Amino acid sequence: MTKDTNWKIARNEAAVRAFLKGWDDRDVEACMAQVTDHMCYLNQPLEAIRGKNNVRKMIASIFAPAKKVEFKLINVFGHGNQVITERLDQWDWNGSGTWQLKLPVCGMFELTEDGKITEWREYYDNQHWSKYGGPSLVL
């Protein structure tokens, strides 16, 4: 790899980490600062959510019932304009200070040449999400 390639991968990984930190902070606008206007969120097996404003609404709808969120990063690695995350997404729905939902997730992020997230795909067990209190992800 070249120095330019290493710099780009590090920048892209930093953008994804900043996006996920926005989740930990429950800060929709911090998340949105890392994405393009035409971003696409694909949450298997649901329909794709297209456009920054629609993704903003989806994230806000998930934040609303959550008292605390933590996306625990297990692995993050990049290649070119792609970043993959292996995570444990943890959710406290009732403010008890304990995690009612611990969800293993793999996320795939595609970034533009200037380091903005343009596509975000998530892979996890949707039944586990629903069983432990996850809100509907349909707009």
Label for each model-derived stretch:
Residues 1-34, 138-139:
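Short, low-complexity N-terminal intrinsically disordered segments enriched in polar/charged residues
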Residues 20, 47, 75-77:
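Structured beta->alpha junctions
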Residues 41-60:
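Short solvent-exposed beta->alpha transition segments
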